[in-house]
């Protein structure tokens, strides 16, 4: 049976984690691209050794883990090095993602992918759910959460697709500019919809 996949995406500071955790509280399994990206560069991993071999020991924190800030700074202004890093990590992330998607045992799985549209991955999902907020709210939330400057947030936003492009790819949208309980209600409604869609897809699988 093919796993029914709902892809959750949204710009930085939109509240993807809040929405994902609300689905998880309803028993929906999560496959989180950011978590997988951290797992493939754990201490002693082949990928981390390759990064240190290429960029030097300054890429390591005191505890032996990857210093993400140092790596970001190293590749930010060097497209060739960024291409090398993506070539190393993307196949590992993709393999781990596919394994987790296939092994999920539930009517549907929530696949959390911040750069879903940017990497043109939306075709892998049965349904695309976008968490949406206005730009100023994104900036304010990210500054508050990460302790970064407005300029840094705007640079990140510039590397992401536009709000309009993301919304154009959405099957469903959660407006995360309101009260937390509004998110809970909206997720509960979508959960029932996805259960019905997954059940329908399963019936079609069996009849074909």
Curated annotation (Swiss-Prot):
Q: Which Pfam families match?
A: CoaE
Domain (DPCK) ranges: 5-201
Q: Name one GO molecular function term.
A: ATP binding
GO CC annotations? cytoplasm
Q: Which pathway, per its entry?
A: Cofactor biosynthesis; coenzyme A biosynthesis; CoA from (R)-pantothenate: step 5/5
Binding sites annotated in the UniProt record for ATP: 13-18
Q: Where in the cell is it found?
A: Cytoplasm
In the record, biological process GO terms are: coenzyme A biosynthetic process
Reactions catalysed, semicolon-separated, are: 3'-dephospho-CoA + ATP = ADP + CoA + H(+)
Q: Which top-level group of life is the source organism from?
A: Bacteria
User: Which PROSITE patterns does the record match to this protein?
Assistant: DPCK
The family line of this record is: Belongs to the CoaE family.
Please give the function described in this protein's UniProt entry.
Answer: Catalyzes the phosphorylation of the 3'-hydroxyl group of dephosphocoenzyme A to form coenzyme A.
* Descriptive protein name: Dephospho-CoA kinase
Origin organism is: Sodalis glossinidius (strain morsitans)
């Amino acid at each position: 049976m093919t796993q029914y996949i709902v892809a959750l995406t949204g710009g930085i500071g939109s509240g993807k984690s809040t929405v994902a955790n609300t689905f998880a509280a309803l028993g929906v399994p999560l496959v989180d691209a950011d978590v997988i990206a951290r797992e493939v560069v754990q201490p002693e991993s082949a990928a981390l050794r390759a990064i240190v071999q290429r960029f030097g020991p300054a890429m390591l924190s005191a505890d032996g883990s990857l210093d993400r800030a140092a790596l970001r700074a190293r590749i930010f202004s060097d497209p060739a090095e960024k291409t090398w890093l993506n070539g190393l990590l993307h196949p590992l992330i993709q393999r781990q993602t596919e394994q987790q998607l296939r092994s999920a045992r539930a009517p549907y799985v929530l696949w959390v992918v911040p750069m879903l549209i940017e990497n043109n991955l939306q075709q892998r999902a049965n349904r695309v759910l976008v968490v949406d907020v206005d730009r100023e709210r994104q900036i304010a939330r990210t500054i508050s959460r990460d302790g970064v400057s407005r300029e840094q947030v705007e640079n990140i936003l510039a590397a992401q697709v536009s709000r309009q492009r993301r919304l154009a790819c959405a099957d469903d949208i959660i407006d995360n500019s309101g009260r937390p309980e509004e998110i809970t209600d909206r997720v509960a409604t979508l959960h029932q919809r996805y259960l019905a869609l997954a059940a329908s897809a399963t019936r079609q699988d069996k009849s074909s």
